[in-house]
């Protein structure tokens, strides 16, 4: 599968990623809590590395669903304020929240095993 042979927005549907923006971020992600770990995928249109994640996510969607994350997504090329909020130096970036607290972030797509390990560590610290 080449980097351009798929619709990059398919991953949003596949993982039930809810769109967020700078105006509604706190209400949706931070205050929309519970015990479920929230993962915000910050990306940019035509970002090669973002598309690598999207492609990998489509190939490994079952494994990513098994992580029991509530997914959100935002194009920070379009929503510059949200990118500034997290002082992004690159995308993709994944930011994690639980019960209103920011727990950490991953910059870049490290690959499925490393992503799974990072999520497992955050979930174990609950």
Q: Where are the regions that the model predicts?
A:
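Non-catalytic, surface beta->alpha helical segment in thiol-disulfide oxidoreductase systems
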Residues: 90, 95-126
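The canonical Cys-X-X-Cys-His
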Residues: 47-50, 94
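Thiol-based oxidoreductase modules, predominantly thioredoxin-like and allied folds used
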Residues: 17-22, 42-44, 61, 66-81
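A short glycine-leucine-enriched loop at secondary-structure breakpoints
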Residues: 85-89
